[in-house]
Amino acid sequence: MSFAGMLNRLHGQPESYDKKSKYKFGRTLGAGTYGVVREADGPSGKVAIKIILKKNVKGNEKMVYAELDMLQRLTHPHIVKFVDWFESRDKFYIVTQLATGGELFDRICDQGKFTEVDASQTIRQIMTAVDYLHDNDVVHRDLKPENLLYVTRDPDSDLVLADFGITKTLDIKEETLTTMAGSFGYAAPEVMEQKGHGKPVDMWSMGVITYTLLCGYSPFRSENLRDLLRECTAAPVPFHERYWKDVSQDAKDFILVLLVPEPEKRWTSKEALGHIWLSGKNATDHNLLPELEAYRRRARLRRVIEIVKLQNRIAKLKEHEEDPSESDMGDAQGASDNHKGDGSRLHALGLFAVREAKQKQESLQVEEELEKESRRRSFSNA
């Protein structure tokens, strides 16, 4: 045992804590209820390290060990790679591949052109990852554009599925999960109704992602749970002529077999991979970028609000650290640096920033209302 290791044992640190010295921590990439995600330099290059406060998962430590076990078993070109893990007296550290190529929609909007053919091949990549998970009885439960990342800035970079924080491994193939999980607007009806759910929830989310990728807006516009549930279960999926006239019928059919309210009637990942649209044969060469750019503008304004929330989460997490002098929680500066132009101005996160963020959120709501009204008029005239 090294001298440093002996000192760590004397200070009550677990044996694996020695690994921490291999990493130099950098900017904060995000924060949640249980901890933060930091960029770091390691022996094999840059990585992402998820830091979880043990105090925040007390009594639910098995949740962390389950995530670790699952990540170590998953090996797929379109799933973020597990690197290592270690722990301290008060924290767990999960080290994974760092995807630096940007989120799905940001990367697409930086291109000169993005067609329906490109969209079908993008969705195919993600669907192969979902199919791999389902073959291994794993349900992701939080599929959304923000969790779809490019590994590098290279034009031919792989797209990977990330964030397995609420993913569940089924004990038996047909096990039913009952906890609320997922993100508003992407969660399946059975999740919102708390009826019990399984693999079909991922297929619903894939339907929402595909729809948004093809037109730049969500198929469901409600802003509260009750209205959203009604919209998902009682109303037909809308394909507004103005935005969908240049999109193939195959693409619409693909979406419709995924956005089926009854989970038992929803297509599986295997069936979806066999759909003709994912072959790209009948997909059009219509450029989707104008609609997607509008989506990105709305997303950027939402990020301004998220940076304020991020700083508040980090502050709360720091309060729970046993040794604040050796904090690993970082700050929100790094996250704002990831989105220069829309978030970097808020690094101080003072009262002015909060006020500015609220004003931008209000402006966004006004813009969306005007957009909805414009669509209603155009739809009625279609």
UniProtKB/Swiss-Prot annotation:
Q: Which GO terms describe its molecular function?
A: ATP binding; calcium/calmodulin-dependent protein kinase activity; calmodulin binding; protein serine kinase activity
What's the name of the protein? Calcium/calmodulin-dependent protein kinase
* SMART domains noted in UniProt: S_TKc (SM00220)
Query: What are the binding positions for ATP in this chain?
Result: 29-37, 50
Region annotation (Disordered) maps to 318-344, 359-382
Which species expresses this protein natively?
A: Metarhizium anisopliae
The record's EC number reads: 2.7.11.17
Which UniProt keyword terms apply here?
A: ATP-binding, Calmodulin-binding, Kinase, Nucleotide-binding, Phosphoprotein, Serine/threonine-protein kinase, Transferase
Q: Which residues cross the membrane?
A: none
Annotated family: Belongs to the protein kinase superfamily. CAMK Ser/Thr protein kinase family. CaMK subfamily.
InterPro entries the UniProt entry points to: Kinase-like_dom_sf (IPR011009), Prot_kinase_dom (IPR000719), Protein_kinase_ATP_BS (IPR017441), Ser/Thr_kinase_AS (IPR008271)
| Keyword Isomerase belongs to the record | no
Which SUPFAM superfamilies does the UniProt entry name for this protein?
Protein kinase-like (PK-like)
Where do the segments described as Calmodulin-binding lie?
291-301
Domain Protein kinase, residue spans = 23-278
What catalytic activity does the UniProt entry give for this protein?
A: L-seryl-[protein] + ATP = O-phospho-L-seryl-[protein] + ADP + H(+); L-threonyl-[protein] + ATP = O-phospho-L-threonyl-[protein] + ADP + H(+)
Q: Where is the active site?
A: 142
